């Protein structure tokens, strides 16, 4: 997989960088593995906006992805690599030996025709799923379960992987992509390798219209709003925000405020907190 750059024929193509989709082999999704999904557009059950800047976009069908990998001991053949409009990662279509078809997150390096399997005693190969107790130290894994049998909940985005650091008792220490080191039960399943399509981090949409196709609406700066709409609003001309630091539309500090509860029960499983992000990496956009 590689990225594709465009010549500046138009303002929209000047900075446009996209993936070349060379790894995608299937043109249409498997009919038995897609369902229609009502798009919430950032609203809750009362119609109130709870997540701003969502709405519109191209119509999609949701692909049913197998995050549990609970067909233990049944081999599956990778029939195709498909595009998924709901995530940056690609999907691998599996044909199991018993006739069942399932989608999984396509690991990096997995090719069409390759065989994958899940279970407690399976070969150490890319795409195979096994308990963390069976994964060798130093190996990279993705789609990691937090609770056994619930399905993979961590490390699922394109290009992501976690590293098995240590094993002690009933727990395995994982170094997550955020650099946080966390303990996970040894019976929880994970898939070997990293998620494919890692080059997506180097892409650029190039124009606002492509962002709208994805269902993302414009973000308006608080400083150009009225005082009734944002704490930064009001004033004559380009007035300063009038505060010691930027705040959210609800008056909370916008940069650097910790949102994790101090006495959260799962804190006992976090051996090392994630690295702190600088203001430059967070971006200084006026919320």
Curated annotation (Swiss-Prot):
Coiled coil: none annotated. GO terms for biological process: translation. Keywords: Ribonucleoprotein, Ribosomal protein, RNA-binding, rRNA-binding. GO terms for cellular component: large ribosomal subunit. Residues 221-287 are annotated as: Disordered. InterPro entries: NA-bd_OB-fold, Rib_uL2_dom2, Ribosomal_uL2, Ribosomal_uL2_bac/org-type, Ribosomal_uL2_C, Ribosomal_uL2_CS, Ribosomal_uL2_dom3, Ribosomal_uL2_RNA-bd_dom. SMART domains: Ribosomal_L2, Ribosomal_L2_C. One of its GO terms (molecular function) is transferase activity. SUPFAM superfamilies: Nucleic acid-binding proteins, Translation proteins SH3-like domain. Residues 271-287 have a biased composition (Basic residues). It holds the Pfam family Ribosomal_L2_C. Part of the 50S ribosomal subunit. Forms a bridge to the 30S subunit in the 70S ribosome. HAMAP family: Ribosomal_uL2_B. One of the primary rRNA binding proteins. Required for association of the 30S and 50S subunits to form the 70S ribosome, for tRNA binding and peptide bond formation. It has been suggested to have peptidyltransferase activity; this is somewhat controversial. Makes several contacts with the 16S rRNA in the 70S ribosome. Belongs to the universal ribosomal protein uL2 family. This is Large ribosomal subunit protein uL2.
